[in-house]
Amino acid sequence: MSEDAVKNAILIAGPTASGKSALAIRMAKATGGFIVNTDSMQVYGVLDLLTARPSRANLAEAEHFLYGHVPPSSTYSTGKWFEDVEALLGRCELQGRVPIFVGGTGLYFRALLGGLSQTPEVSAQVRDHWRGRMEAEGAKALHAVLCVRDPAIAAALQPSDSQRIVRALEVLESTGKSLLEWQKVKGRALVDDQSAQKIVLRPDRAWLGVRIARRFSAMWAEGAIDEVRALLALDLDPALPAMKAIGVREVSAFLAETMSREEAIERSVIATRQYAKRQSTWFRNQLGEDWRVYASGEEVFQGGSFRDPQ
């Protein structure tokens, strides 16, 4: 642990639609703290509704940082988020206040507490080579290449995960070492693991499924169609992360009149439930035993479980 790691931070993890944002606001009010986005999709602009970013009313209740600050035309990495958090925590006006990290991206939480892996720079020539092959051959073909050259990391990646497959191949060619080996070398942590309050929400699965369905119907009614229309007007590369946000493909199909409203909503709800299941599985298997598990945000405040770090 780095000596200058922030002490007494609050970390709130959990699947989408589990009530994390409401809990974070309640904690910010109780502690005078500020909220930091810890979700890789909520960093992108334009998609306020589809990425379930805090509403204007939410933003008025507590200070929020690192939401919607990245243009959807960009690719935003864990490393860039780490740099942005480091700069944020160094701001004078935030010193002495409790940072409340809330979101559903496990790798962000891992970086906060354990530091970032010291992966090497890759030459433009190598990068262009593999990205060109990805564009020409597709993710499945390059995943097959990775299975031969680096089977250990290939087994850990989905065959459709084009960004991470290319990164693994780039690093292997540039250094002769697997990305897994580089990932073992950690940098400094930003948050002190020992003093942090680490909370993970694990709601009832049936309850979460109903909540997801209701939330997406509300998104549709509140303007998700207009969001996707605005995104499509930017004429972006379909491979960009923002273009892969749940709901974008379905609403796009509705706008193209190749899918009905009902089917677009149903498919988006199914995709969101599947995503929530993957998130829950990751948190269950990857977070340490010192993370306290709650069924809801309300439960955190019951029985004196929550302690004000101030």
UniProtKB/Swiss-Prot annotation:
Region (Interaction with substrate tRNA): 39-42, 163-167
Residues making up the signal peptide according to the UniProt record: none
InterPro entries associated with the record: Dimethylallyltransferase (IPR039657), IPT (IPR018022), P-loop_NTPase (IPR027417)
Binding site residues for substrate: T16, A17, S18, G19, K20, S21
Pfam families the record matches: IPPT
EC number(s) stated in the UniProt entry for this protein: 2.5.1.75
GO biological process: tRNA modification
A GO molecular function held by the record: ATP binding
Keywords, comma-separated and alphabetical: ATP-binding, Magnesium, Nucleotide-binding, Transferase, tRNA processing
Residues where ATP binds: G14, P15, T16, A17, S18, G19, K20, S21
Cofactor dependence: Mg(2+)
UniProt catalytic activity: adenosine(37) in tRNA + dimethylallyl diphosphate = N(6)-dimethylallyladenosine(37) in tRNA + diphosphate
Oligomeric and partner information: Monomer.
Function: Catalyzes the transfer of a dimethylallyl group onto the adenine at position 37 in tRNAs that read codons beginning with uridine, leading to the formation of N6-(dimethylallyl)adenosine (i(6)A).
Xref: HAMAP family: IPP_trans (MF_00185)
This protein's name: tRNA dimethylallyltransferase
